[in-house]
Amino acid sequence: MGEDGKLYIIREEILSDSLKKTLKVKELLESGKVKTINEAVKQVGISRSAFYKYRDYVFPFSKFSKGKIITLSMVLDHMPGVLSSILDVVANARGNVVTINQSMPSMGVASVTISIDTQYMEMSLENFLEKLSSQNGVRKIEILGE
C-alpha cells in the first residue's frame, strides 16, 4: 500500500488476532512496560515477523484524534440537565467545545452536534466516548469527522 492509501475506522471485534496483538505490542512499547520489541512480542504471543508486517498499518483511533477537532453527533432525551452533563464530561476530560448546535426537540429528543478540540484531553477518545455514552439521556453518539 502506498503512502496515500485510504484510512478506515474498524471496530476492534472484527480485527484479526494478529492485528490485535500488533496493537498490544505497540501499547506495551509506548507505555514503557517492556523495553524491547522481542520482549513485547513474546509477552503478547505474536511472531516478530507478524509484528513488523503490520506495525506501520494499524493504529488505535486515539492516535489520529489527539490534538485535533472532532465533531460528534448526538441524540439526547429532552430532559433538564442532559446537555449539561455532556458538557461536564467534556470539561472534566479537558476537552474544549469549539461549536455546539442543538435542534428543536421533537418527540422527546433533540439532535446535538458538538465540535471539540482534543489537544489537552487527558483520556483516550475511546474512554471519552464511553463516558459520554453512559450519561443519562444519551441515546446515540456518532463521530462525524475530524
Swiss-Prot record:
Positions of the ACT domain: 71-146
InterPro entries for this protein: ACT-like_dom_sf (IPR045865), ACT_dom (IPR002912), UPF0735_ACT_dom-cont (IPR008310)
Top-level lineage group: Bacteria
Similarity-based family: Belongs to the UPF0735 family.
Name used for this protein in its record: UPF0735 ACT domain-containing protein Teth39_0139
Organism: Thermoanaerobacter pseudethanolicus (strain ATCC 33223 / 39E)
